Each structure stands twice: as structure tokens, then as C-alpha cells.
Amino acid sequence: MSGGKGKAGSSEKASTSRSAKAGLTFPVGRVHRLLRKGNYAQRVGSGAPVYLTSVLEYLAAEILELAGNAARDNKKSRIIPRHLQLAIRNDEELNKLLGHVTIAQGGVLPNIHQNLLPKKSGKSAKASQEL
């Protein structure tokens, strides 16, 4: 009677996800399903979703780290779209990657043109010192 499931002699392991095997947090299985359903190609290799998932996870971590720094600089504990905007636009590579992306409620970067700034002339500085 070897047909039943018994505890003795069972060598079944708990299944590990492809995300866990790759050491990722983002879901590899979901990315694979989306690649198959998206009609990007007739066939999808087994390594492609793992690679794409790792790239997506890295980009998300990079953006969130910079946005967290921007939130901390503004003395806030919650990341808002403004912090994402500041993080992306102040980073050269992320700005190049997401240059044509509009972030809702992101605002604009603070920038004052040089011609509009008050001029530092020597006469006004000397006159104020004499008084």
C-alpha cells in the first residue's frame, strides 16, 4: 500500500517561488504572465521575466530611496508626488529616462533665471557700509 500520503518517507518540499529563488521581492510569475499575454513575442524565455523583474525592482528602489531623501529634507515622513518629482528631476540619469513623463501633482523644480536675480554691485555694498 504505497498509494496513500504518509508522513514517513515523504520527501516533498514546499514549493519556492521564482521570486524567492532569484532573491527578488517583485513577482516573477506575474511579470511572466504579463509578457505572455501582452503579445510582445510568440514565445517568452524562462530568464526574461526574472531579468525584467530585477530591473523593475532596482528602478523602484532607486526612485524610492531618492524620494525618501527628498521627503526627509522637507521634514516629512510620507512620500508624496512632489518628492518623486524632485527625486527624478534632480537625478541626471533618471531625468533622462523619465524626461517625457508627467507626474500628477508633482509641481516644477525651483529655478530662477540669472537675469532676474538681484545684482551684486560694489557701489551699493560700499554705500551701505558707510552708513
From Swiss-Prot:
Keyword list, A-Z: Acetylation, Chromosome, DNA damage, DNA repair, DNA-binding, Isopeptide bond, Methylation, Nucleosome core, Nucleus, Phosphoprotein, Ubl conjugation
Residues the record lists as N5-methylglutamine modifications: Q105
PTM annotation (N-acetylserine): residues: S2
Intervals of motif [ST]-Q motif: 128-129
Miscellaneous remark of the record: In contrast to vertebrates and insects, its C-terminus is not monoubiquitinated.
Subunit structure: The nucleosome is a histone octamer containing two molecules each of H2A, H2B, H3 and H4 assembled in one H3-H4 heterotetramer and two H2A-H2B heterodimers. The octamer wraps approximately 147 bp of DNA.
Free-text function comment from the UniProt entry: Core component of nucleosome which plays a central role in DNA double strand break (DSB) repair. Nucleosomes wrap and compact DNA into chromatin, limiting DNA accessibility to the cellular machineries which require DNA as a template. Histones thereby play a central role in transcription regulation, DNA repair, DNA replication and chromosomal stability. DNA accessibility is regulated via a complex set of post-translational modifications of histones, also called histone code, and nucleosome remodeling.
Protein name: Histone H2A.1
Source organism of the structure: Scheffersomyces stipitis (strain ATCC 58785 / CBS 6054 / NBRC 10063 / NRRL Y-11545)
